[in-house]
Amino acid sequence: MSKRAKKRDKLMVEIVQVYSASRDEEQVTDLKKTDYLPYLFNLVMPKQFYKSPNRIVMARLYPDVQKHDEQAAEYFEGFQTPCFDLPTNLFPEKAPIDKIVFMPKVMLPMGFEAGGVFGPGVLPRRCYPVDLISPDHKGPMPPLFVGLRGMNVSLSSMINTFLGMYDSSDGQEPHVYEMHATNHHYKNDLAPEELMLRPDFTLSVAYTLPASMCLPSPYPYPSVPAQDNIYTPDLSKVLILMPHQFNITVAILSTVNNPHDPSVAFATMGDDEDCPEFELPSDVFPICEGVNRPIFLPKRFMPKGFDACCVFKPGSLSELWYIKSIGRFGNPQDQYNCFITPPLFVGKYTRNAASINMLEEISVHFDQKDREIAKSLARLRLDALRLNSRNNTTKGFLVMESDKPTTPAGAYSVESYEKASEDGCIAKVTQECATKSTDTRDDGMNTADYQSQFPELEQDSEPEPEPEPEPQTEDEGEDEDIEILASLCSGSI
C-alpha cells in the first residue's frame, strides 16, 4: 500500500517497485479515448529512485487525489504519446497489459520520458503488485502508474529540498511499524501493568545478536523485493528477553533482523525434521487457517530455552488484535513493510531446564566481538607498519639506453627522460658518439636542455676531450640506436 505526503503542493509516493528496461527514442503510440487520464506532473518519486540504475517504476495512485482530467483527455485524444515495452516480469501471465493508457509527456511526473496508467478496476487483484496493496483491501483495484524515468534527470533545488525531507530508498529500507492512533476504548481493554503481567502469556523482547565481523563480498547482491506470502525465520541466534518466566510468551519479530530463511521453510515441509507443536490459547489467539496459520519451527531453529515455538507471518494478525492483546507497549522492531502488521513469535518456555542468564550471554557475545575487532585492528596496524617499512627503504632507479628491441628482465620501458624523472630516476648512463651536445632526441627535446634541468648530474671538473672515434663497422653503427629503459636496482646509487 502506498503512502503519500503533501508539501508545497507536491504529492509524493514513498512505496514503489522499481525495475530495469530500455526504450527506443522514437517509440510512440496514439492516445485513444480514455476514462482515466490524471495530471501527474506534481507526483514526486522517492529520492532513491532518481539515483537508481533501474528506470521503471510502478506506483499506486489514488482516484480522489490524482483525479481524471476530462479536458486533457479530450484535448490529447488522437495525439502521439511516448510509450515503451513493458517487461514480461512486471505482471503475471494473461494480465491485461494492453489496457495501459500512455500519457502525454506534459502530464508525466518530473524526470519521466514515458509512462502510462491502468485505470481504477482495470487490473484484477491477482495482477496487482502485492507490495502496493493491503491484504485486506476490498473493492476494485486502485489505479496504477507505470513509468520510465529519463537517463539524466535534473531536479530543481526546491524539489531536492522536498525530497530530502521525505528521503526514502527502495522497499528494502527499514521502517518501524506504528499502530494508528485511536481514541476508542474497547470493552476488555487492559491497563499497561495488566498487559505486561497478564495471566495467560507474557510479553517479551526478541533480541538478535549482531552478526560477526566479516569482509564485504566483492559480488553485490541484488535488491530482493519483500514478499510476505510465507515467513519462516531462523531464530537459533535470537535471545527472548522475558520480564518474568511464564509458560507462553510472545514477542514482535523484525523482518529486517529476522528475515525469511528458505532453508527453514524446506525443513518445516519435510518429514525428517521434528517440529514440536502446542495448543495456542483460543481465548487469546484467533483461529487462523490457510496462509495465515502459525508455522511451527524445527528444534534447531528455535531460540534457546523453548520446547516449541511458532511464528505468525506479517499481516496474518489484525491491528485490532495487537491493540487489544499487546497494546502499544510492544518493543518496536524494524520492518521492510510498515503497512501491514509485523510478524509475531509465540513460544512455549522450557520449565524443567535451568533458566538462561540472557544478559550474561549478551555480555559474553559482545566481549567476543570486541576481541575479534581488536585482532582485526592489530592485523591492520601490522600491515600498515609493513607497508611503511617497505616504503622507507631507499631504492635507486637507473636509466639505461640500449639497442635491444626487447626490454630486459627486471626493467620496464619509459617514453622519455621526463617520465623516468617522474618515476624517481636519479642517474643516467648513456652511450654517445662524438656529436654535438645539442643533438635532438626522438622526443623532440635537446640533450643540452635536458641536462640543464639536472645540474647535479654534471661533473665538477671540465670534461676530458673525447678521443676520436675509431672507424666502426656497419654493425657497430647500428648499436647507436637507443631505446630508453628504466631498471630497478637493489640498492641506492
Swiss-Prot record:
The lineage of its organism: Eukaryota, Metazoa, Ecdysozoa, Arthropoda, Hexapoda. This is DM7 family protein GM11958. Residues 457-483 have a biased composition (Acidic residues). Keywords: Repeat. Residues 434-493 are annotated as: Disordered. SMART domains: DM7. Belongs to the DM7 family.
